[in-house]
Amino acid sequence: MQELVMPSMIRLANRFHFLFSATRRVDFLAPLLLRLFLAPVMIAAGWQKAGNFDATAAWFGNDDWGLGLPFPALLATLAIATELVGGILLLVGLATRYVAVPLMITMLVAAFSVHWQNGWFAVAPSDPETSMARPLAALGIPAAQRSLENSAEVGQRLQAARGLLREHGHYSWLTERGNFVVLNNGIEFAATYFIMLLVLFFYGAGRWLSVDYWIERRFHSFTAGK
């Protein structure tokens, strides 16, 4: 029996391996989609900072309500250049691995200097039963337990706010475009963008639909012809 089952399982595994290997023909789609997702995010962030440069520089340098960083005008300029130029380069797939480095640094600075004290979530969960922190709290992680307690309080505040709006406001109109949430402003987005940029740093912009690919291809054909 075993002599019949094992060869069949091996043949089945080989077929699946062949099918998965065939998908490598379109492996350029993954880095392409990462670039198309990240590029407008970075360009929009840089554009917003550039359009409000004085306010951005003031926020970088102010100790009371800002980041309290030295040389705020210089740092604001560097942040704007990194996001604007980096976003454009990501879009066309030029110098992708190089530009991923300053963009990752920007995400780390944002995560640790702006969002870290607010925890993980960008939008605060309002139901402890469905929070992704619940399994971690079950493992005895204190931060996860505090997150669940915060979720319960967020839920109470949202319920109170919705009650006031139903009683005194046009609730259906106010929520027509989406429900009210509590913005937590945690590191979730910065960490997610960092991970996506890290993938591009290691794997590059991808084949066919990136300038990097055609430069590399031209370079190899040039060196091979020598």
For every predicted segment, state its role.
Residues 57-71:
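Perimembrane loop-to-helix junctions flanking transmembrane segments
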